[in-house]
């Protein structure tokens, strides 16, 4: 049986809201970047570096990265609990799902740490 222990919020409605809000954050970030690319008169490395050197842009990027990871975790958790279970995968389905969730979690943590290193590293 699938438990809610590894769910993001223990509640399907809350997970749904988190995914919707995170998608709005990602969409706003993409629209801003697209507008910047389209309307920047000189899109050079210096201009791009200056944009991402601003603290507000670093924070916006970090918030978007965290929103993306929350969105991804909920989606991957849903895929794992729907398809990687005993009924669909046989007697090892629950173990496979556990491994899958650990790998997904480790990858998302690595992506966040890597993003922080890129944003504020030397």
Language model region names:
Residues 1-122:
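Membrane-embedded alpha-helical bundles that constitute the cytochrome b-like, heme-associated redox core
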């Amino acid at each position: 049986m699938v438990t809610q222990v590894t769910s993001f919020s223990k509640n399907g409605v809350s997970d749904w809201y988190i995914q919707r809000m995170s998608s709005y954050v990602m969409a706003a970030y993409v629209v801003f970047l697209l507008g910047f690319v389209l309307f920047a008169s000189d899109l050079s490395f210096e201009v791009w570096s200056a944009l991402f050197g601003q603290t507000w842009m670093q924070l916006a990027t970090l918030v978007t990265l965290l929103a993306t990871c929350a969105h991804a975790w909920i989606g991957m958790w849903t895929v794992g609990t729907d398809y990687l279970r005993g009924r669909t995968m046989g007697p090892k389905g629950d173990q496979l799902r556990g491994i899958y969730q650990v790998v997904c979690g480790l990858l998302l943590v690595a992506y966040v740490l890597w993003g922080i290193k890129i944003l504020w590293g030397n």
